[in-house]
Amino acid sequence: MKKAEIGLIGLAVMGENLALNMESKGFTVAVFNRTAARVDAFVSGRGMKKNILPCHTLQEMTESLECPRKIMMMVKAGRAVDELIEQLLPLLDKRDILIDGGNSHFLDTIRRAQYVESKGLLYIGTGVSGGEEGALRGPSMMPGGSPAAWAHVKTIFQSICAKVEDGTPCCDWVGENGAGHFVKMIHNGIEYGDMQLICEAYHLMQTLLGLSADEMHQVFAEWNLGELNSYLIKITGDILAHKDG
């Protein structure tokens, strides 16, 4: 049986969608979830008849991967990541690669990268932006960590990520240690600031100017034609144009 190019642990919606995205780009993906029923439900549902290998133990997953093994962890940030790393280390060989695709704090990622590297393995902490739909259709990705790991995951990451109009991938190496999760933190801070500004603009237009939803849609649509052009401005305009059935 062909071995998988990458393994993915954690089959919540983000994990499922990333696995489907990778498979759609021609990669064979081994998947594992703490509850085996979730694995079975995935491969008999959305993952049916796809190049996805169901694994019911971590050992089964590690044995199903080509070397150097690449394992992406899509689990809740915090203690769960540390516990999973400890479970995986005895099953892995030197130069295998662990990837944290969750929203870990960059200081935790620095600590984990140093710890994993001290065991002879490589570590990547990557920001993944775009939510559930982005995970399926193309997220923005911000990988950082062990520099030697990048060559092994670059093709996969740049295949599944979003692309700008000229085809440039929305993914590149951002630095060592916790750089990937640091960049994601800054990205989120900017995004939440933009969202607050949009909320305030909406509030002023609605309460002070008395504009209707259609009129506010026109304002946001015009803003999106100029220097304020952005995904958030666009979807705000789209929401205001939506009519409930």
Protein language model annotation of sequence segments:
Residues 11, 32, 73-74, 101-102, ...:
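Glycine- and other small-residue-rich loops at beta-strand/loop junctions that grip anionic moieties
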Residues 72-87:
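Glycine/threonine-rich flexible loop motifs
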Residues 60, 70, 80, 111:
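Residue-level recognition of oxygen-bearing side chains
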Residues 1-69, 91-95, 132-135:
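NAD(P)+-binding Rossmann beta1-loop-alpha1 motif at the extreme N-terminus of oxidoreductases
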Residues 66, 76-77, 146:
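Helix-capping/helix-break motifs at membrane-protein junctions
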Residues 36, 58, 78, 106-108:
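The beta1-alpha1 cofactor-binding region of Rossmann-like NAD(H)/NADP(H)-dependent oxidoreductases
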Residues 81-85, 99-100, 105-217, 225-245:
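Rossmann-fold dinucleotide-binding core
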